[in-house]
Amino acid sequence: PNTTIQWSCGGIDLGVTHSPGHAPGHVTIHGHGVYHAGDLLFTAHSGRVDLPGSDPLAQWNSILYARKLLLNLPKEWRLIPGHRYDWIDGTTPDWVSIEDALKHNFSLNSPVLQQLEGN
């Protein structure tokens, strides 16, 4: 869990991270200006963990790992979620910048992450 490997094919180089929580085999993929978050992170929050095979603690550890990874990616890159949900203002964005995700995503800024880090 929470291990990133580099995958290359032709001119495409991607980082693939095992990000369990929502599902045991969930992965996120980043490269070429995008972070494909799948069901780990949405534009404003994170994926569900009340499904068969979900693991809430693994999800929080995956979000913590993702946050550390996102802090080191270019801030203008796009975070693309696996699902689109309405925001409180009624918009339904397809993506957010990594900068905006780090500032406004509830899960990326949750006090739970501070507890996991031991702060």
Task: List each language-model region with its residue ranges.
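Short acidic-hydrophobic, aromatic-tinged amphipathic segments that line or gate anion-handling sites
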Residues: 1-4
